[in-house]
Amino acid sequence: MAYDLEEQEQIDEFKAWWKTYGKYVLLAVAVVLFTFFGIQGWRYYQHRQALMASTQYETLSQADAKDLKLIRSISAELMDKFSGTAYAGRAALIVAKANYIANDSKSAKAQLDWARNNAQEEPIKAIAQLQLAAMQLEE
C-alpha cells in the first residue's frame, strides 16, 4: 500500500509541476520543432536553388558563343533569380565576353560592373575588375 501511496504522491507532484510549467515546456518543444523544420526547409530551398542555377549555368556554358540572344536570356535569368549563387557572377563574365565580341561594349561594361559589385566569389570580382579596367584602357 505504501508503494501505491508513494506513486500517487509522485503523480500528484508531477501534475502540480505540469500545471505550473507545462505551457513553457510545450512552448519550448514547439520552438525547437519549428526551428528544426525551418532550418531543414531553408537548406532544402538553398539546395534546390543551387541545383536550378547549376542547370542554367550548364546550359549557358554549352550555348553557342554566336547565339547572343540565348546567352543574354540565360545570363539575365541567372543574375536575377539566382544572384545569391556563384553561378550568377560567372554568367555575368560569360555574357560580358559575348557582348564584347559582338561589339556591344556598353553592355559588356554593365555586366562586368554587375559582376564586380555582386559576384559571390572574390576571384570573379577580381577578374571582372581587371576586364573592366582593360576595356577602359582600350577607349
PLM regions and their residue ranges:
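Short solvent-exposed coil/turn linkers within tandem alpha-helical repeat scaffolds
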Residues: 24, 79-88, 102, 116-125
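Inward-facing hydrophobic residues that define packing positions of alpha-helical scaffold repeats
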Residues: 75, 112-113
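N-terminal positive-inside, membrane-proximal cytosolic segments immediately preceding the first
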Residues: 1-31
